[in-house]
């Protein structure tokens, strides 16, 4: 029998993630595999902000097409990039243990967000981050920052930006210090994207190794990530819209924090729910209802114009 084929994007971070799964497959499932690099739409279009490209699955669609054709056996994604509704026949075989979920401030000159001068330019790919930055500092200029982690850091070092915001998990995985000043926001200060810090392994549901891959699943991380994805699904959202949501477990209790608003930091809704773990999905529905009653759908429609 031939090796399983892992589909992955070609960035250093994506390949770290694919190799991580490759090593775990060998060690924990006794399965040999090889990696096939796939360029996605989001990788090909680098001169346009992600929200302007349009469509869902900017970093997953091409991988999903290869899964459906049987040309690859599994696709390794950053879970935050995975649409909440799957193509027919596909699903997540596992969600890995979460790394650090936080967003991180990086700058050559300034120690933190509040020390930036008025009009400072902050680079980010994310409308969610832009919204939460503007909520704190309306006087800052948030601009689109595309490219892989190293490209973004070079733009910071060359002075194109006064600061940039990256995911802490990616910096840790690549063992990158990043810049002279590096400070992670607490989850309370900046609510992460759904699934941030976790990897999702996508496969055909009828693949003979679909069940086998569940050995790589982390139950606690998967539970929290599925709550977050349920919240996004209820708002018909994707990864390119200004929504942050984070679920965390504290013993038998769960806390779900969420925020959405316009990318300019206006018309922001922020709420949280806490309760018994056994009622977690009911809590998500209650939180959704509160957001919808507060005008969430209307705000997200306005956000499409940015």
Swiss-Prot record:
Pathway: Porphyrin-containing compound metabolism; protoporphyrin-IX biosynthesis; coproporphyrinogen-III from 5-aminolevulinate: step 2/4. Binds 1 dipyrromethane group covalently. It is an enzyme of class 2 (transferase). It holds the Pfam family Porphobil_deam. It catalyses: 4 porphobilinogen + H2O = hydroxymethylbilane + 4 NH4(+). Its EC number is 2.5.1.61. The keyword Transferase applies. One of its GO terms (cellular component) is cytoplasm. Gene3D superfamilies: Periplasmic binding protein-like II, Porphobilinogen deaminase, C-terminal domain. Keywords: Porphyrin biosynthesis, Transferase. It comes from the Bacteria. HAMAP family: Porphobil_deam (MF_00260). NCBIfam families: hemC. Tetrapolymerization of the monopyrrole PBG into the hydroxymethylbilane pre-uroporphyrinogen in several discrete steps. The porphobilinogen subunits are added to the dipyrromethane group. Monomer. Belongs to the HMBS family. This is Porphobilinogen deaminase.
